[in-house]
């Protein structure tokens, strides 16, 4: 008789050698497209290590982003600009190992950090290869229409790409701070043009950060082949993402408007992830009257 794998507790946290959960379908781009067609919201959180990634996966989170936000929440930097490609590969590999050990099904996305793709398409390809070899299923890069040729170059060579518009933290100094983007008619038109260019270039996903809810809703309808993931962009996107530390209330400063502390009413970290998934799926988070502009 085959015995179930034994989970041995250690003083340093426990990740079982094989998942005790029922087998689930691995998340893939076709699976995400099916979810969108069915009207099911996509959930995403950031994670930077094996344990949190495994717990998020067990709670049913579909996508895990190894964000360059690790510079601020893990390394103590004031922005994401100081994060290196080596840093991103290290944390991506850690998350990938955590998911592998529990037979995780989440779709793993890794940020391409500042300075790793702007010089040339060839530089971007080399950087993307390192992240994919570390375990990523997709890479994410920030920037408007100027990144479209790079996106197309990567996609044509088999690298799935998630784009990022609105507030782009890597260029926060050029934007004048952490401000809502696309509020003016001119700003909205520019965002729309860039979003369409990125979809045409082959981007499969698009993070919209701190973009007015109505504009995000309109863009989502206009981008049938590019799944919009909102953070401070209202409830009309195809899915939502939050930074791990924000959604767990691990923050000593003022909470951003678009954040909700899911740990406040949860008995465990896994419970907080489950509450987040449930709230996004049933439409109670985000609440446009509280979490959007």
UniProtKB/Swiss-Prot annotation:
Mg(2+) binds at residues 68, 111, 142. InterPro entries: Pantoate_hydroxy_MeTrfase, Pyrv/PenolPyrv_kinase-like_dom, Pyrv_kinase-like_dom_sf. It is an enzyme of class 2 (transferase). One of its GO terms (molecular function) is 3-methyl-2-oxobutanoate hydroxymethyltransferase activity. Homodecamer; pentamer of dimers. Belongs to the PanB family. This is 3-methyl-2-oxobutanoate hydroxymethyltransferase. It comes from Delftia acidovorans (strain DSM 14801 / SPH-1).
